[in-house]
Amino acid sequence: MYKIRRGLGFFGFTLLVIVLFSACANNVSRNLTSSAELLPSQCRIVKHIMGETCVPINPQRIIAASDSTLEAALILGLKPTGTTTYAQQSDYLRERFESTASVGLDSRLLSLEKILTIKPDLILATDDYGEQQELYNRLSQISPTVIAKWWDGKNIRWKECFQLFAQAFGKTSEAEKIVNAYNQRIAELQQRMGDRLQNTLISIIEIYPDRIRLFGKTKTVSLSSTIIEDIGLPRPPSQEEGMDISLESIGDADGDIIFLMARDPEAQLYQQVMNHPLWKQLKAVQAGKIYKVENSYWGGSGYIAANLVLDDLFKYLLK
């Protein structure tokens, strides 16, 4: 008898769990459907890597699910309702807005529960990890979602992403002014450098706690290396493609000027590089042309960071 009662009890408990789960699932499904529906007159069509999305004309509750989407929103005068923890850790962005709701660590670890709580009317994301289909399938059930292609296999596409985000925000006129101002600064720097422009080899290096990275023209690139390319400054032959190098290959980091980023200046590897005989033999080191720059914006993701990089370039290249 005891065994029969226990079996019935277990069956009843299981049935209760199924009923509750189904009720919750139906409730979430209703929330998802109602959140994603928009009348054609209330939205604009935006084309992106996952197809076309009808986004609201004047979005009020925006989820910026990456640092590049957050940066685009901020420079265009918008404050997202939610973003990732990772995006909020960028010093140069954190200075420009008050804390906002976190919807997960990064685009791979988004909390759908937190996003549902915000009830967004627009979600922007990038395919940072090549998982755009899964990402889109999840997010587009909640709200109109636009996903930009960040990496094309050789370079980051920060400018193209910005244009797409501006279109989604309905801020294309403002975006054009930002792009024009950037291009004007590039032209000014080119003009002021004169003949030095074609005769100054620029090296970009970052020392992590566990590796040394050269940022090249393709493959392992950063926002700063694309800006150097925009200006037309030459790179050392060893930096056509970015890569990680060993301490014994530190000679590949040489140039007329070295811009140096360091994740942790107290780390053992950083100290080893600074004290290594091969480092001390570099032309830029001997000429005193090593300039330490901030990795947060030299490795940034939009026009806020780009202008901070240009500030550094005006400062150091026109000495």
Please name every model-derived segment:
Residues 134-172, 267-294:
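Charged, glycine-enriched surface loops/patches
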Residues 141-208, 304-319:
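Extracytoplasmic substrate-binding proteins
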Residues 116-125, 144, 250, 254-258:
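Proline-aspartate-enriched helix->loop->beta-strand connector
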Residues 2-13, 20-68, 173-203, 266-270, ...:
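Bacterial Sec-exported substrate-binding components of ABC uptake systems
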Residues 256-319:
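Structured C-terminal subdomain patch of bacterial secreted/periplasmic proteins
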Residues 66-114, 127-128:
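A short, structured surface patch at a secondary-structure boundary
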Residues 48-50, 103-112, 240-247:
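Short helix-initiation/N-cap motifs at beta->coil->alpha
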Residues 87-92, 213-242:
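Alpha-helical, coiled-coil/dimerization segments enriched in small aliphatic residues
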